[in-house]
Design a protein with these regions (language model features):
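Residues lining hydrophobic/aromatic ligand-binding pockets adjacent to catalytic sites
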Residues: 1-253
């Protein structure tokens, strides 16, 4: 068994600001990635959740890392059911959006032909990593309001079908997926789709947290994501970046 350990992003604001990891000369994103890859064999790309990266960008990531290095990449937020601003779409595809009544839109608001174009653009962004053998999992962190019901199951199936040929990992943020009545069914559903179940270690007691379910649903891979035990900041209002919600500097107690 081989275990790969990494962080979510090599340029996380708190990681850079701590000045405890990167040497002084690693002052650019390129230099930080090159240094990071000498310390860890894996990283999770977080920026792809906020906007679909350019293929040139992912090619640069592949070029700046050694052959054994792996990238897990988060799926674009529109695909996972989160509110999305038109501003983050590629300009040519943004023009294909129908008129919107609100500032943000959701996957359900997107016409089928534009959905296909967005999936294609996302996979184009992954191709340099895939071609170099450095693409790990494509991680779908679904929105907290994605319930385990008919429409929720159908949306997960749609995403997995759209990413056929890729190793897909799924993370649910709603308790209906793992309550006593549905835990076994959810794991069976994940196994039937051949997706990687995500073991989530995070604070408990919130509407958007789930218990850690230590099960494996994929023949080759398992995934554990450590979100910390940060009760006070988990749902902090006004956070502009994910790092504002996390605190990993714990006392020995």
């Amino acid at each position: 068994m081989k275990v790969l350990v990494g962080t979510a992003s090599w340029s996380d604001k708190s990681l850079v600001a701590s000045k405890k990891f990167y040497p002084r000369e690693a002052s650019t994103p390129e230099a930080r990635l090159r240094f990071y890859a000498t310390r860890f064999p894996l990283v999770e790309i977080d920026t792809s959740y906020y906007a679909i990266p350019l293929a040139q960008t992912s090619q640069a990531w592949a070029d700046r890392t050694p052959g054994h290095f792996a990238f897990n990449i988060k799926a674009f937020r529109l695909f996972t059911g989160h509110a999305t601003s038109p501003r983050v779409l590629p300009p040519d595809l943004r023009a294909e959006l129908p008129p919107l009544k609100k500032e943000n839109f959701y996957f359900r608001d997107v016409p089928p032909e534009l959905r296909r174009a967005l999936w294609d653009r996302f996979k184009e962004a992954l191709e340099p990593l895939r071609a170099s053998g450095k693409l790990g999992m494509v991680h779908f962190q679904f929105a907290p309001w994605l319930l385990r019901n008919k429409s929720g199951l159908a949306h997960v199936e749609l995403c997995v079908e759209a990413m056929a040929g890729y190793t897909v990992s799924v993370e649910f943020r709603n308790k209906t997926w793992f309550d006593d009545a549905h835990l076994g069914q959810t794991l069976a559903f994940e196994r039937a789709l051949n997706v990687v179940h995500t073991v989530v270690d995070g604070p408990q007691g919130f509407h958007n947290t789930v218990p850690p379910v230590w099960e494996s649903t994929h023949m080759n891979y398992s995934l554990v994501r450590l979100h910390g035990r940060n009760q006070e900041t988990w749902n902090i209002k006004g956070a502009t970046v994910a790092s504002e919600r996390f605190d990993y500097d714990y006392s020995d107690a």
